[in-house]
Amino acid sequence: IAALIAQYKASKGQAPLCLDTDPVNSTFHGYTSLNVRRLQIMDGDEINSRNFDSLVELIAPSKDDVVIDNGASSFVPLSHYLVTNQVPALLHEMGHELVVHTVITGGQALVDTLSGFAQLASQFPAEARFVVWLNPYWGPIEHEGKTFEQLKAYTANKARVAAIIQIPDLKKETYGQDLSDMLQDRLT
């Protein structure tokens, strides 16, 4: 998702500050045309506060949007660190808006990803906004006949959601394979 956001911003003439903090896969860093900087903020299973301070020091003076890819393996500890250390309020005081992008997937993971979104929305303070990406790759984003917009996870947090992005369900035989190939090769 980070690569898509950064590419979109670049296509609009913006120059976002791109940072990859994923401790397992530095996929975002592989997009050389996006000038992604790699930062190691994890120390084992925990956030290294000194390294995290370096991240904030990069964000603070930025006049452009900042796109950070943190990866699934560090998402829970990073979210916990952000909330317990009141980082969203700090960023807000610096004139920045924290926008958390989260993915809801269809199929078997639907209930888990809905629950994850609801937990994020309840844990993050009011300063944080959310962009929800609906990914139908594994199945439709529906539960018991209700669409995402009808589900409690959304209706209870609707005011916090800045946007909902529907990822198109591309046929693998055509555009789906092309997009997959582009992403694998980290092309922009």
Name what the model sees in each region.
Residues 1-5:
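Glycine-rich phosphate-binding P-loop
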Residues 47-56, 82:
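Glycine-rich, highly charged phosphate/nucleotide-binding loops
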Residues 24-41:
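P-loop NTPase switch/communication element
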Residues 15-16, 36, 66, 98, ...:
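Hydrophobic anchor at the start of a short beta-strand
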Residues 180-188:
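NTP-binding/hydrolysis catalytic cores, primarily Walker-type P-loop NTPases
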Residues 74-169, 173-177:
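Conserved catalytic-core segment of NTP-binding enzymes
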Residues 12-26:
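Short beta-strand-centered segment that lines the nucleotide-binding/catalytic pocket of NTP-utilizing
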Residues 40-44, 64-82:
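Switch II (G3) loop of P-loop NTPases
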